[in-house]
Amino acid sequence: MSPAPLEVVLLVFVLACAVGAALLEDVLAAILAFAAYSLGISVLWVFLQAPDVGLTEAAVGAGIMTILFLLAVAKTAREPSGRTLESVRWRSLVLVGAFVGVLALVLPAVPAIGDPAAPVLSYDVTQYYLANSYEETGVTNAVTAVLAAYRGLDTLGEATVVFTAAVAVLVVFDREVLT
Amino acid sequence: MSDAGQSRPPEGAAYVESTIIMTTVRLIAPFVITYGLFVMFHGADSPGGGFQGGVIVGAMVVMVGFAFGVAPAREWVKNDVLVAVATTGALTFVAVGLGAQLLGGRFLEYASYEPLYHHASKYLIELVELAIGAIVAAVVVGLYFSLARGHVGSTEEDEA
């Protein structure tokens, strides 16, 4: 299946933003490029039929993370060097190139999007969730059923991680109040 | 701030008062928090859930902080409120899990509540989503306030 024109535009946009975030010398510009990248990715998630993930990406990646980055930048001093782009080190470039090469080699082995024979679809657990999640949990969004019911313990762990983040910030900042 | 004057560098100024931003935020804030609560409540039947909804609710407070300054936002949302919301969320989640054990099931086995209330599983999942949302919203706001204030020895104790 060939990608829709909008998907191609989005992919190019995301790629350009990612390169921009990595190469732009100005931290503020890099943060904005990163936010745009995150927003593009969140729309791509919707194209990939994963609206739950897309919503998270848009809220956390493009929204809150950008604000926290901006705050951090506002709190720190940076010296304008006058250049637009960061100078690229050859070693980093070789490393990134090798990583992209490995990914490109693996990519053909990934099943096509929506392929009914894809292992993730034919796997017993997936079929079980799709067949029984409404009966057993009473919620129609299977993602929520897996998240809150079948994998509830994992989600409790996730919520604890978020809670711990606030505690960790208090410890690092040597404070007793969040505000 | 040490160079509090008119020659403040643009990157040092964390807060710029703007009537447009304040009016816009005042207008859209109720809609943002409503949408956040919708995403939290409706996560069982549509995309969304506690994590996403919590971030959106937290973003509402962050928006107010951006528009009106961090100090007024701090006055508005007290530390006690944030801590209470986050811990209530965490304790609710654990209580739902332990309650199932008290009723003879396993930890977080919603089905064991079924004799008490029909469709218990669905409502408990909603409750758990709300608990997650409470944790996430409070932590997002807390991270924002903490980052805005900085380290205890920082020279920029209160900027806004």
Regions found by a protein language model. Give the residues of each.
Chain A
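Alpha-helical transmembrane segments of multi-pass membrane proteins predominantly involved
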Residues: 1-179
